[in-house]
């Protein structure tokens, strides 16, 4: 007997359709969805062992980073199968399944239940933060401007400072026009996305389009074409088209840290393709696989990376992106009320 397990994009198809002009990567992910939307699999009972088997097979057939991360998923099956029995309660099953998913070392992998969410946060928790809300408030002051999800002001050395804390916070074309107009006479721009954990990829694309003057290759994407670990389509190029609105023509320093993940990681990939952009700070947190979701027999939902993306040089960015200048926040500067990373960016812009 067969059962269709629905695999769907984390973002709704209606939203993707509405924003299709900018959603370059999301559009291709939708194509992958159409190809693999129904996964035919042996029906598993709603028991702890049945849910374990269902989860293992979903990941086995659809996860996209097994080879890149050198993960032996069959060995992991043997390791965790002995921990599962049909007499365990839901909390015990949740713990085993979450532990198994943690072997993927992927911040895009989650197990959602009514009572808890399984997650993997080592991609940023094991590293220095290199960002301080207290210090940032010293630079923004109290009279900063707000445009959608952006906070911005002109620093005292005529450098524009813009902070974007989450790509889940909407930013409109009018917002971006206002920011660029306000900063147009500045020496340069500091664009701070530290601790931006991602969000809506269309916001990342919309913002990146304000920094390019021609159609720019920013990376590649693949989607799964079969159940094998290496069953992928050919890499398909991804481009950013220049905005038809105001575009920033001066130097930009992009600030990053380990908290930059998912859509923010992709945005960093885009910006590294722009000739006037320099990246300063720490290695990003990664998260380059576009996430899909699937359901277990008991109704729990698993999210996982299904479509790998690459930078313009065909490199994986799942484990993050190196800055052009690796700069850490120092205790000495912190005690002086200075942000080492912002100060390094100011020096670069003032010396150019």
Report residues per predicted region.
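Flexible, low-complexity junctional segments that flank or bridge functional domains
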Residues: 37-224, 229-237, 251, 293, ...
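Bacterial Sec-dependent N-terminal signal peptides
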Residues: 1-45
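C-terminal "post-core" interaction segments
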Residues: 39-53, 91, 158-159, 197-352
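Alpha-helix termination/capping residues and helix-transition junctions
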Residues: 32, 183-185, 246
